[in-house]
Amino acid sequence: IEPSNQDLYEAGLAARKKVLGEEYVNPNIEKGEKDHLTGKIQTMVTEYCWGGAWTDDTLDHKTRSMLNLAILTALGKMNELKSHTRGALRNGCTVEEITEVLAHATVYCGIPAGVDAFRSAREALDQENTEDLL
């Protein structure tokens, strides 16, 4: 039996906050509550992405984070890569693992995509004050 949309939403919201942090998620949800346009995409992201994919136990969150970094590099989605770099740290990825995922993605996605990804990840790591992790 498939879970209801409300169940997916609640599970997705919990997963989303765990990975990305409440300080990132809450303002986006609040904006969505005030604006029909952004509300629709916030609901879709929370239900289907986070409630569907991220709550499945087949892959752990650390593995999913590493996959997301590679996929976002390939797609050139650097804004999302920044938030998922911070999420990867929360999910137990080391700076060394993040570096290797981006290096591996660069081989297949090309140097320009890799340069953008490394630059964006560096910005995210700087915001997380990761000197103690290096």
Regions found by a protein language model. Give the residues of each.
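Substrate/cofactor-recognition hotspot
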Residues: 111-115
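Short alpha-helical scaffolding segments that buttress acidic/His motifs in well-ordered protein cores
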Residues: 45-49, 66-73, 101-106
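Mid-chain, well-packed structural core segment of small domains
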Residues: 66-69, 73-99
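Acidic, glycine/proline-rich low-complexity segments that act as flexible tails and inter-domain linkers
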Residues: 1-62, 90, 116-134
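Short, charged low-complexity intrinsically disordered segments located at boundaries
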Residues: 43-45, 76, 98-103, 132-134
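A glycine-rich phosphate/pyrophosphate-binding beta-strand-loop-alpha-helix module
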Residues: 96-100, 116-119
